[in-house]
Amino acid sequence: MNKDELLKDYQEIFGEAGKDVFFSPGRINVIGEHTDYNGGHVFPAAISLGVYGVYGPRTDNKVRLYSGNVDGDIVEFDLNDDSVEKDDRFWANYFKGVITYLRQREDGEKINHGFNLYVKADLPSGSGLSSSAAIEMLMGMILKDEFDLDVDRPSLARMGQKTENEFVGLNSGIMDQFACKIGRAHVWT
């Protein structure tokens, strides 16, 4: 996937230029699949496939999400809505959960305006390469960087796990989020 294509897609969807492009990797796991949430040992690594996001700030409080991998419309909600509801477009809940939980932090008031976000993955959904964790870590990284949040990578990983467990309602350990957020080239996590 190339940056120019992503920026072009963003422009076509939102009618304006995107500001920044982000990437969050997926992960493989050599041993220990389905054992991390039972306290077992795992051996994951980040990979070169993942989820890309093009961010653009807004002057209002609307968050507008669009996935290049799912047929459908723009998902839109207001940051000022105290109870962000789960969406019937399941993929959007990973973004909504991270936004909700980061806004609840002490410095969450820094997330003080809306944004447009175009996402596209080269990870096959349901392939076991942690597309959901990559989405969560992408959203966390974007909010951290664009709103100057004081949150470290392990805390973002835990926020992603909380999103998956509590907001989305899936049972997961912390392995996927840690591998996607802390992993880097040529290093096993």
Go through each PLM region and give its residues.
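ATP-binding N-lobe of GHMP and related small-molecule kinases
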Residues: M1-L129, A133, G140-R153, R158-V168, ...
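Conserved small/polar residues in nucleotide/adenosyl-binding loops
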Residues: A185-T189
